[in-house]
C-alpha cells in the first residue's frame, strides 16, 4: 500500500494571484504542432488562442492528407482537418527540441483522428514510441474516433523523439503533437514516466473538457457526472495559488459532486485495470464550494483499497482553496477502490471535485551509445543524407535507421556496426568522422560521387571487416595499411570503378580502365593463423553467449523446483487435469495461484519452452489469465498463473455450476472472451493463435469476468497422452476449424471458428456434438442454422432463460456466431468485428431493461456507487 501525501493550504497575496493569471496566458513552454498543414504556416486556435505550427520542420518523411469532407464538421477542432501519414518505412519519427531541454518535465500529447483520409474506410492500428521505448498502442475504432495519448516525462536529452511504428495493420498517421512544460516539483514519482489513465472534472455540466486558458498547463479535464449525485458549485474563484503546485483550474474546482440523499455516508470510486500488474498514481483534488454555517462541518476519511490514507483521522476541505491528496507510492491489483467516508461529527456528506490517475511506464530500453549518435548525426549533416534518419539510430530493437545495422547486448547501449550509404548522392571527401564509429564492421560508400584520396584512418577501425568504395571519383594511391589488411584476409576491400585510384605504385600515373576490382585475400600461413585465431575467438564468444541465453528469462519470475513444491504444499491439491499436465493449487506470498506442471511427455524441449515463456510474460490483458512465473529445472517445467476459483464457462453451460447465467451475463462473458482473443490476434507481436478455444479454457472469476486460459501453449507442447499428434493440429473435436484442420495450417480465423462454436453454446446451452442427431445435424452449427432458417429463435435460445432475453438481440448474436463458425475462412468475421458486435449488443441489452444495478458504469472502466452500509468498508481510525 502506498502512502499518501497531504498538501497543506498556503495563502498568497493578491498580487501573486494576478501574476499567476498573467502567466496563464504565457505559451513560452508550449510546442503545438498541427500535422499536415503547409510548411511554414501557422494559426491561432479560435477557442484556446494557442498558436499551432506546421510539422514540416520536425519530420523528414510522410505524406499530407485532408480528412474526408463529410467528416469536416463545424464543431471539429481545426487540428483534425489534416493528417500526416507514413506509408513507407517501419519507423517514422518526429524530432522536437522544446524551449527547455534535458532535465525538464513535460506533458507530451499525441492526438489521432482517421477521418478516412485515404478513402480506404479502415482505421489503422499501430504503435507509438517515446524515444526508444514503447509508449502505447494506437487503435482507432472508426473514422470519427479521436484517440489522445498523454504522458508526463522528464527529458533525458535536449530533444524529444516521438515515433510511429507500423504493425502492418494500416498506415500510421498523426494529427496533433503537443508539448507542455510542467513544474519539476509536481507529479514527482520514482517512475520514468506517467501515462494518463483518467482525468475527471466531477460535476461539470458541459460536454467539452476544460483546458488552456483555464489550465495553465493545458491539461484536458474531462467532464463526468454520476447519476443520483448532487452538483455543488460556486461562482467565486477557487484560489489557484493554494501552493500545492498542481494548480487545477478554478473552473474545475468550482464544481463538486456529493450524494443527493443526506443519509448517504460515503462515496466509492473503483475500477478494474485491464492488467492487475499495472501500477497507478492517484491524485484527488478537493475544494469546499459551500460557505457552511458555523454549526455545520464537512469532514470525511479517505481510504484506498480499504486502508485509510495516512494523514489525520479526518479530512476537512478548505473553503475556496484547493487541497490535493496523492499517493506517494504506486498501487496495483485487479481491483482499485478509494472511498470517501463521512466523519462521525460531520453534518455534511463527502464531496469530490477532480481526480487524476496515471499509470507508470518503466522505460527500460537504452538509447544508442551517445558517441555513435553524435558521429552518425555529423555524417548526416556533412553529406546532407536524404534518408528517414530521425529518432534513435538503433532502437527500438528491430527498427534501425535505413542503411544502419546495430549490435545489441544486455544492459549496454546499442552500437552502430554497419553503415550503408551506397547510392546516397554523397559528394566531397571521406570525412574523418567515420573513425569515431569505433565498433564499425561494415562500411559501404559505393556508387556516390566522393572525391579525394582514400584516407589512412579507415585502416585504423579495429573491427572493420568490409569496406566498399566502388564507383566513386577517388584519386591517389590506396593506403598501404588497407592493402595489407586486404592481403592478410582481415578486410574485404572493394575499390573498383575509381579510374584515378591507384592500387600500387606502378599505376601512380597510369589511367586505369573502368573495371571492378575485388582485391583477393592471400592464402598464407599468417592468414591461416589469423583465421584460426578468429574461429577460436568466435567459438568462445558463442559459448559465452549460449551460457547467457540458457539462464532464467526473468529472475524476478523464475522459481526453483523446490519452491514449486513449497508453494503447492508438496502438490497437495489438484485443481484439474489440463491438456498439458495437471494443475495444482498453491499460495505464493499470500496470494492464491494455479500451477500447471507440464508433463514430461508433452515438453518439446527447452528452446520451445523458453520461447513460449518469453512470449507469455509480455502478454497482459484483463481478459487473459496472467502468467506470474515459471520454473525449468532439469526435466521439471511449470507455469504459475493467477488463481481463478469460480470455475469455467464449461461448468456453467454443463450445469456443473448450479448458477444460471442471465442473458446479459452471457453477453458480457462472451465479450470478455472475445476481447481476450482479439488482443492475442492484434495486440501481440507476433500475433498469437490460441488453437484450442473452448468453454473449459474460459475461466470465470467471482465477478463473472471471463479470462482466456492456455493461450499459446499449443504451439510448443503436445497434448498429454497424445504425443504422436502434430503440434500444428492442437485443438478439440467440435471446435476445430475444418478448413485449416484438413491442411494442418492454423491462423487467427481458426480461433474465430472455435469462438463461434463457443458462442453458439452460450446462446443455446446445448452440447457441440449431439450423438442423438443424424450425421448431418450432429454439430451445433448445423442444428442452429436449420432452426434459424425456420425463423424460430425461441427454440434456439437456452430454455433455462425462459422469456428473459431480447429476441432481436438473440437473433443478431446467433447470426454473428454462425458467421464466425462458417466453414469458409473468407466469410468469417475477424475478432475485432466480433468485439464490436458484442459491445453494441451488450449496450442495447443493458439499456433495454433494468438490471437492478445501482452502480454507474462508464466505458472507461470506472464505477461509482453510494451506500449507507458502514459494515462493508473499514471504520475510520
UniProtKB/Swiss-Prot annotation:
Residues 25-517 are extracellular. It is found in: Cell membrane. The active site is at residue 692. LRR repeats lie at residues 439-462, 463-484. It comes from the Eukaryota. Gene3D superfamilies: Phosphorylase Kinase, domain 1, Ribonuclease Inhibitor, Transferase(Phosphotransferase) domain 1. Belongs to the protein kinase superfamily. Ser/Thr protein kinase family. This is Putative leucine-rich repeat receptor-like serine/threonine-protein kinase At2g19230. Glycans are attached at residues 142, 233, 261, 295, 405, 420. It is an enzyme of class 2 (transferase). The modification Phosphotyrosine is found at residue 641.
Amino acid at each position: 500500500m502506498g502512502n499518501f501525501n497531504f498538501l497543506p493550504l498556503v495563502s498568497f497575496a493578491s498580487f501573486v494571484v494576478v501574476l499567476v493569471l498573467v502567466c496563464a496566458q504565457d505559451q513560452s513552454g508550449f510546442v503545438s504542432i498541427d500535422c499536415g498543414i503547409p510548411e511554414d504556416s501557422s494559426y491561432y486556435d479560435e477557442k484556446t488562442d494557442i498558436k499551432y505550427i506546421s510539422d514540416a520542420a520536425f519530420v523528414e518523411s510522410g505524406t499530407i492528407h485532408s480528412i474526408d469532407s463529410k467528416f469536416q464538421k463545424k464543431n471539429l477542432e481545426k487540428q483534425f482537418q489534416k493528417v500526416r501519414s507514413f506509408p513507407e518505412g517501419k519507423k517514422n519519427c518526429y524530432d522536437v527540441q522544446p524551449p527547455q531541454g534535458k532535465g525538464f518535465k513535460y506533458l507530451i500529447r499525441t492526438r489521432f483522428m482517421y477521418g478516412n483520409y485515404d478513402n480506404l474506410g479502415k482505421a489503422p492500428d499501430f504503435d507509438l514510441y517515446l524515444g526508444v521505448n514503447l509508449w502505447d498502442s494506437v487503435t482507432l475504432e472508426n473514422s470519427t474516433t479521436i484517440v489522445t495519448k498523454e504522458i508526463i516525462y522528464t527529458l533525458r536529452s535536449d530533444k524529444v523523439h516521438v515515433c510511429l511504428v507500423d504493425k502492418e495493420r494500416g498506415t500510421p498517421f498523426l494529427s496533433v503533437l503537443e508539448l507542455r512544460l510542467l513544474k519539476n516539483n509536481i507529479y514527482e514519482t520514482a517512475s520514468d514516466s506517467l501515462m494518463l489513465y483518467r482525468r475527471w472534472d466531477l460535476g461539470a455540466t458541459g460536454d467539452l473538457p476544460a483546458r488552456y486558458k483555464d489550465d495553465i498547463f493545458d491539461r484536458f479535464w474531462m467532464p463526468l457526472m454520476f447519476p443520483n449525485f448532487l452538483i455543488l458549485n460556486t461562482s467565486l474563484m477557487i484560489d489557484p495559488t493554494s501552493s500545492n503546485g498542481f494548480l487545477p483550474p478554478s473552473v474545475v474546482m468550482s464544481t463538486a459532486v456529493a450524494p443527493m440523499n443526506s443519509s448517504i455516508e460515503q462515496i466509492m470510486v473503483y475500477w478494474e485495470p485491464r492488467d492487475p500488474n499495472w501500477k497507478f498514481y492517484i491524485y484527488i483534488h478537493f475544494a469546499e464550494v459551500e460557505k457552511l454555517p458555523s454549526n455545520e462541518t464537512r469532514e470525511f476519511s479517505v481510504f484506498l483499497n480499504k486502508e485509510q490514507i495516512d494523514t489525520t483521522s479526518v479530512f476537512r476541505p478548505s473553503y475556496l482553496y484547493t487541497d490535493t491528496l496523492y499517493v506517494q507510492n504506486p498501487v496495483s491489483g485487479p481491483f482499485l477502490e478509494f472511498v470517501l467516508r463521512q466523519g462521525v461529527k460531520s453534518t455534511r456528506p463527502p464531496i469530490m471535485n477532480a481526480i487524476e490517475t496515471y499509470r507508470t511506464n518503466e522505460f527500460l530500453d537504452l538509447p544508442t551509445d551517445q558517441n555513435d549518435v553524435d558521429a552518425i548525426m555529423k555524417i548526416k549533416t556533412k553529406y546532407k543524407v536524404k534518408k528517414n534518419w530521425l529518432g534513435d539510430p538503433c532502437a527500438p530493437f528491430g527498427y534501425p535507421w535505413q542503411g544502419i545495422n546495430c549490435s545489441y547486448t544486455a544492459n549496454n547501449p546499442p552500437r552502430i556496426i554497419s553503415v550503408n550509404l551506397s547510392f546516397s548522392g554523397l559528394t566531397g571527401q571521406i570525412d574523418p568522422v567515420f573513425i569515431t564509429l569505433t565498433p564499425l564492421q561494415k562500411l559501404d560508400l559505393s556508387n556516390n560521387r566522393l572525391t579525394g584520396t582514400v584516407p589512412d584512418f579507415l585502416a585504423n577501425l579495429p573491427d572493420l571487416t568490409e569496406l566498399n568504395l566502388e564507383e566513386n571519383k577517388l584519386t591517389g594511391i590506396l593506403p598501404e595499411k588497407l592493402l595489407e589488411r586486404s592481403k592478410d584476409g582481415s578486410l574485404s576491400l572493394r575499390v573498383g570503378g575509381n579510374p584515378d585510384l591507384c592500387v600500387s605504385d606502378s599505376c601512380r600515373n597510369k589511367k586505369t580502365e573502368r573495371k571492378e576490382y575485388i582485391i583477393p585475400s592471400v592464402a598464407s600461413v599468417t592468414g591461416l593463423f589469423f583465421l584460426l585465431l578468429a574461429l577460436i575467438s568466435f567459438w568462445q564468444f558463442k559459448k559465452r553467449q549460449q551460457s547467457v541465453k540458457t539462464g532464467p528469462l526473468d529472475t524476478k519470475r523464475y522459481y526453483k523446483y523446490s519452491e514449486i513444491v513449497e508453494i503447492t504444499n508438496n502438490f497437495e491439491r489438484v485443481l484439474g487435469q489440463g491438456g498439458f499436465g495437471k494443475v495444482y493449487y498453491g499460495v505464493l506470498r499470500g496470494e492464491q495461484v494455479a500451477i500447471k506442471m507440464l508433463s514430461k511427455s508433452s515438453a518439446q524441449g527447452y528452446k520451445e519452452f523458453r520461447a513460449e515463456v518469453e512470449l507469455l510474460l509480455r502478454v497482459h490483458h484483463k481478459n487473459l489469465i496472467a502468467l506470474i512465473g515459471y520454473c525449468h529445472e532439469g526435466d521439471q517445467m511449470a507455469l504459475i498463473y493467477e488463481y481463478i476459483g469460480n470455475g469455467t464457462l464449461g461448468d456453467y453451460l454443463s450445469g456443473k455450476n448450479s448458477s444460471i447465467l442471465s442473458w446479459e451475463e452471457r453477453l458480457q462473458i462472451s465479450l470478455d472472451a472475445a476481447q481476450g482473443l482479439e488482443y492475442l490476434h492484434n495486440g501481440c507481436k507476433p500475433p498469437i493463435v490460441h488453437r484450442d478455444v473452448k468453454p473449459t479454457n474460459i475461466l470465470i472469476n467471482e465477478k463473472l469476468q471471463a479470462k482466456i486460459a492456455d493461450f499459446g501453449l499449443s504451439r510448443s507442447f503436445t497434448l498429454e497422452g497424445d504425443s504422436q499428434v502434430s503440434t500444428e493440429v492442437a485443438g478439440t473435436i467440435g471446435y476445430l476449424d475444418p478448413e485449416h484442420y484438413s491442411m494442418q495450417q492454423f491462423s487467427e480465423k481458426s480461433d474465430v471458428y472455435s469462438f463461434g462454436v463457443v458462442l453458439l453454446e452460450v446462446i443455446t446451452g446445448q452440447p457441440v456434438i449431439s450423438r442423438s442427431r443424424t450425421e448431418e445435424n450432429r454439430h451445433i452449427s448445423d442444428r442452429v442454422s436449420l432452426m434459424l432458417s425456420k425463423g424460430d429463435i425461441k427454440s434456439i435460445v437456452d430454455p433455462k432463460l425462459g422469456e428473459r432475453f431480447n429476441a432481436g438481440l438473440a437473433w443478431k448474436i446467433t447470426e454473428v456466431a454462425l458467421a464466425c463458425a462458417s466453414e469458409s475462412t473468407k466469410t468469417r468475421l475477424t475478432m475485432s468485428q466480433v468485439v464490436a458486435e458484442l459491445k453494441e449488443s451488450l449496450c442495447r441489452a443493458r439499456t433495454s431493461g433494468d438490471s437492478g444495478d445501482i452502480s454507474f458504469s462508464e466505458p472507461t472502466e470506472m464505477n461509482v456507487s453510494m451506500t449507507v452500509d458502514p459494515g462493508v468498508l473499514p471504520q475510520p481510525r
